[in-house]
């Protein structure tokens, strides 16, 4: 769709004919000429004339194109529109407009007619989803010694074999009368 923009920036889209020696034949690469240069021959500026229509390719020195179609010719009924949809996350410093003010469907809801062709999204992971691979106590003990955590007294929850700790004795204060203990 943006081929004319890429060509204006110095990109050249070439359609390469199929190799005669198979897909794994040795290939030579053209040297990189830098941005704005056409293989060292001449500087490339803005293209002359109007931009090419969408779907046209520059064929370079390979002549006419081979019969290769990278996408299907027929379009779905909703594919005729070429407008861009706004992103769900606004740029920094911009205030997002409410969905009703935009006049279109909400960005979280599919366009009419598109829901039938799309598969349902996968379910979101559970809130308590964690990697459940267990680590033996020997590995944790060696990690504790390697990191020097066996010398740390301020973090009692890191000691191995201790499933919970008494927060009031560890913090050095007694609970107030009528308060809920942790």
Curated annotation (Swiss-Prot):
The gene is Cited4. It is found in: Nucleus; Cytoplasm. Keywords: Activator, Cytoplasm, Nucleus, Transcription, Transcription regulation. Residues 22-129 are annotated as: Disordered. This is Cbp/p300-interacting transactivator 4. It comes from Mus musculus (Mouse). Residues 64-89 have a biased composition (Polar residues). The keyword Ubl conjugation does not apply. Belongs to the CITED family. GO terms for molecular function: transcription coactivator activity. Interacts via its C-terminal region with the CH1 domain of CREBBP and EP300. Interacts with all TFAP2/AP-2 isoforms. InterPro entries: CITED (IPR007576). Disulfide bonds: none annotated. One of its GO terms (biological process) is positive regulation of DNA-templated transcription.
């Amino acid at each position: 769709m943006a081929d004319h923009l890429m060509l204006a920036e110095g990109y050249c889209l070439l359609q390469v004919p199929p190799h005669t020696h198979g897909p794994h034949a040795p290939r030579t690469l053209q040297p990189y000429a830098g941005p704005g240069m056409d293989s060292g021959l001449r500087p490339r500026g803005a293209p002359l004339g109007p931009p090419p229509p969408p779907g046209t390719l520059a064929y370079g020195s390979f002549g006419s194109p081979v019969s290769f179609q990278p996408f299907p010719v027929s379009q779905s009924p909703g594919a005729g529109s070429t407008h861009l949809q706004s992103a769900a996350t606004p740029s920094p410093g911009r205030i997002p407009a409410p969905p009703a003010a935009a006049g279109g469907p909400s960005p979280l809801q599919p366009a009419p007619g598109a829901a039938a062709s799309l598969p349902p999204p996968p379910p979101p992971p559970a809130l308590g989803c964690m990697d459940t691979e267990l680590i033996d106590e020997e590995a944790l003990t060696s990690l504790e010694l390697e990191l020097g955590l066996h010398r740390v007294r301020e973090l009692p929850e890191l000691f191995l074999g201790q499933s919970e700790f008494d927060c009031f004795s560890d913090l050095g204060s007694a609970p107030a009368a009528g308060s809920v203990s942790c």
